[in-house]
Amino acid sequence: MRHAGTQDIETPRLLLRRLLPEDAPQMYANWASDPEVTRYLRWEPHKSPAETRELLAAWALLYPNPDYYQWAMVEKATGQVFGSISLYNSLPGEPQQKTEWPGLDLTDGVWEPGYCIGRKWWNKGFTTEALRAVVAYWFT
């Protein structure tokens, strides 16, 4: 894998692009403030759009890094930012962990997807569509 960072990806129904601080109102309304949606995330539900904007501003600083992958999921038909999808390194180089799986090249760690979408978009195939596109991007 040649790390290229978060680049725009299009699918028939989605635009996957970088999250921006201006996305805070939609992110807050569509998923970041919902305890059911954020239940298994690494952060608690947001209490205000300002909290969401602060998180997005911090994430924006990471986009110049070529191994940072965090996309907004935008529904093309409506322009709504309704979720996010990312790739993250869950084993970023601990030498002792790399030897636990003999025969596997774990030089670059272990990369895993993460995703979160607003309830209104559940069970409509959006996450599957986004994940397929991200996996295709990852392996090209």
Regions found by a protein language model. Give the residues of each.
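GNAT-family acyltransferases
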Residues: 1-120, 137
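Conserved acetyl-CoA-binding loop-helix of GNAT-fold acetyltransferases
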Residues: 115-116, 122-140
